Amino acid sequence: MEAVLRHPSLSRLKPPNPNAQRTPALSITVPFRLRLPNRRLTAAAVFQDQTNPRNPASKGGDDDEAYGEVDRIVSSRTIKNPVFAEDGSATTVTATEYLVEWKDGHEPSWIPAEAIAADVVAEYETPWWTAAKKADAAEITALLADETLRRDPDAEDAQGRTAMHFAAGLGSEECVRALAEAGADVGRPERAGGGLTPLHIAVGYGRPAAVRALLELGAEPEAPDGQGRTPLELVQDVLAKTPKGNPATFERRLALEAAAKELEKAVYEWGEVEKVVDGRGEGKWREYLVEWRDGGDREWVRAAWVAEDLVKDFDAGLEYAVAEAVVNKREAAEGEGKWEYLVKWVDIEEATWEPAENVDAELLQEFEQRQSGVAAGGDAPPPPPVAG
């Protein structure tokens, strides 16, 4: 809040000499001083219209001595002002304006922050940011409910952070919900600090309750930050840099993992991969095209979410087939108590001998149960016929 509170000490705004020559023009410079009462402010206060004068109200005495004195601030808003370069290109500068009430009874006007005395700004801003930086849900709710003021739940500090960012970082589910109920944006990125959304901040600080609340309130789980990272990628980066097995970081890792799990629920539907059929990308962007065991459509899935053994087999060039049953076994050539199994395939006519590690554990268990039944003289179900 330092940047918000360091404004020129200006509590009175003086109009220009009304006898000075007036040249109609359109100005976009800020800051400007209020022309009161012989100028009219536009609602957005982005362009200053100097071509529409108003008749000054009589205050008695010389008009040069007519002042508009601020009574108090009753609302705020964040605006974007255009800035034009010499080459004609345009950018925007974000600024804060305040709706001020005047002691002389003039109707409230929107004034740039830098044109208002620091003590007046502080009187309005300090209660809000004190509550926001503590994630004080009760005080935030009370301030938003104050009908004498119109609080903007998306008010920004100098870094473009809102109260929602602080509530997310401190893990206050109650404060997150109170702000959202008042209309706060649950997905607004901060202007500084990497363009993080509240969801990035909540997961990065290991706040699972805040992550869950933000997702329930509509936060986009795959929105990128300023570096192009999704919230899940950010927490994976943080976890990778947080030491394992260190008592000093044990609780932090637990919190980060809990927050990551909340995100995973929103991003992924868990399913069993039948096989990997293709791959693309490199490094952190590596993805695999997988077939699901339940018959769902093929999908591209990030490498981190595919079982390591499947990835290794695909990268090694191994092919997959669907086994129907194990029909026989024999001791492997290398001996040492190792076995090979004769596997009947669904999509391959000829059965093949495979090492145990290449055969589904459930099929092996079924085969052994059949063999046990035969050895005991029971009626074990026969294996499927083998072509040959």
Swiss-Prot record:
It comes from the Eukaryota. ANK repeats lie at residues 123-158, 159-188, 194-223. Keywords: ANK repeat, Chloroplast, Plastid, Repeat, Ribonucleoprotein, Signal recognition particle, Transit peptide. SUPFAM superfamilies: Ankyrin repeat, Chromo domain-like. CDD domains: CD3_cpSRP43_like. GO terms for biological process: protein heterotrimerization; response to high light intensity. Pfam families: Ank_2 (PF12796), Ank_5 (PF13857), Chromo (PF00385). Residues 1-24, 46-66 are annotated as: Disordered. The keyword Repeat applies. One of its GO terms (molecular function) is disordered domain specific binding. One of its GO terms (cellular component) is signal recognition particle, endoplasmic reticulum targeting. This is Probable signal recognition particle 43 kDa protein, chloroplastic. It comes from Oryza sativa subsp. japonica (Rice).
